Amino acid sequence: MQKEKVWDKLSTDTEERMNAANELFSDRKVVPSQNGVALLEAVIRAGDRINLEGNNQKQADFLAECLGSCDSEKINNLHMVQSAVPLPIHLDIFDKGIAKKLDFAYGGPMAAKVAEFLREGKLELGAIHTYLELFARYFMDLTPRVSLICAYEGDKDGNLYTGFNTEDTPVIAEATKFRQGIVIAQVNKLVDKVQRVDIPGEWVDAVIESPKPFYLEPLFTRDPANITDTQVLMGMMALKGIYGEYGVQRLNHGIGFFTAAIELLLPTYGNELGLKGKICKHFALNPHPTMIPAIEDGWVESIHSFGGELGMQKYCEARPDIFFIGPDGSMRSNRAYSQTAGHYATDMFIGGTLQIDKYGNSSTATASRVAGFGGAPNMGCDAKGRRHVTDSWLKCGAEFEDQAALLGDMPRGKRLVVQMQETFKEKMDPSFVEKLDAWNLAKNANLDLAPVMIYSDDLTHIVTEEGIAYLAKCRGLEERMAAIRGVAGYTEVGLSADPKETKTLRERGIVKTPEDLGIDRSRANRSMLAAKSVKDLVDCSGGLYEPPARFVNW
């Protein structure tokens, strides 16, 4: 007689694991913090796929410490799937043998350490993803068996308030719980009733009030005092030669001083150019403090945020016409939704990088740093499924002559994808190279694919201190390479430029210098910025912006 097939192995296994942890609970779903390590040892098995909530900003740091304190004889060979690995403890668990494999999106401060662990064989890399790509795999082949998340508030029934820094939590919890997994949350505070139910209690198996609030990284805060004159010049070129030229109204700004400079130029140079009301209306963007002057000056209509930003909560709550504010009066971020908006609803992505090769491929992965990509590849690409029309999208598509080779006379738009980078970085390290370091990283980490952030066929513009290369206007790869050489300065790539060829490209408007754009280099200095310090941002916000202590020097 044929044995009856069992269809509920996952839920049965989950029940067995939770039963093993029964004695650790104090009240309904509450587990005392001193039982944190024991709880993880009860519900996690060697070889499990684990999500440890490491976001851009908020970190489930207490649960990370608990995981790092587990007995590696019991808990080992874990496959970690998480957005970011910005804390030392995230790699300590690999050093201790508790974890073996990593699939992630962003390395941040641990970028150099990730590269070191790869070289030493302490860490096996699955892939470097973009955020939305990793989230998608949570619902396919990388579903966590146990997820360790964090929230501001939780109650005895497991309801969570994630609020300003909701970030990745909903997608993690849903993917895990609806595949019969286990969800454990650390909360800053246990309350009788949460301020707002962001994660329903049915999705949460255990709640731990952590000894201290979860760590928040002010990742997108840039001190205007550190913006250089060169960055101001490049910002002026971008505003006049790209934003104004294409009338970009829906966009995303990547992290860094280049885009911070642009944000602070809107109320000054942007107004001088008469661009208010014509550009920069709708953003998929974290609440950058450097956006405050532009918001106050009436440039922005809406901002949906991937995450919060430390110190910006009161300001966002006081501007409900701009930010997405709930009935309780607090903002809710959501990385999955904002990444979706960034992919389909924006007309431009603009941000920095670490290396660009002679073809225009761009990467933040170098021989010594595995920085990851975050959301850049998701927004820094042409969304082929897009079907709605905007003027800037159509204009860029009309310029993209190579598209006709595959589509014939069928019109289609194209997203503007802009990389801003000075020709040399710190220590005179060239930004333009013949071959990306990503190739060596792929070899050292046994990756099938070199980790490229933005591929050349998606890249439409490069901005350096030398000028702008309008790559979408180029006819074929050779002309694109010539345009790149024309703005690559004194790098090896730039020195191979043919002056006559560059001159022809300038005449055709494919390469534009500041002079071609009518920009006076002598005006490109910090005096053009709407705020020149963090104190200026605080004053502009009417005291609503409360910067982290590291940025307070007055």
UniProtKB/Swiss-Prot annotation:
<dbReference type="GO" id="GO:0005737">
    <property type="term" value="C:cytoplasm"/>
</dbReference>
<protein>
    <recommendedName>
        <fullName>Acetyl-S-ACP:malonate ACP transferase</fullName>
        <ecNumber>2.3.1.187</ecNumber>
    </recommendedName>
</protein>
<keyword id="KW-0963">Cytoplasm</keyword>
<dbReference type="InterPro" id="IPR037171">
    <property type="entry name" value="NagB/RpiA_transferase-like"/>
</dbReference>
<comment type="function">
    <text>Alpha subunit of the biotin-independent and biotin-dependent malonate decarboxylase multienzyme complex (EC 4.1.1.88 and EC 7.2.4.4, respectively). Acts as an acyl-carrier protein (ACP) transferase component. This first step in malonate decarboxylation involves the exchange of an acetyl thioester residue bound to the activated ACP subunit for a malonyl thioester residue. Has a weak activity with acetyl-CoA as substrate.</text>
</comment>
<dbReference type="Pfam" id="PF16957">
    <property type="entry name" value="Mal_decarbox_Al"/>
</dbReference>
<keyword id="KW-0808">Transferase</keyword>
<dbReference type="InterPro" id="IPR005777">
    <property type="entry name" value="MadA"/>
</dbReference>
<dbReference type="GO" id="GO:0016740">
    <property type="term" value="F:transferase activity"/>
</dbReference>
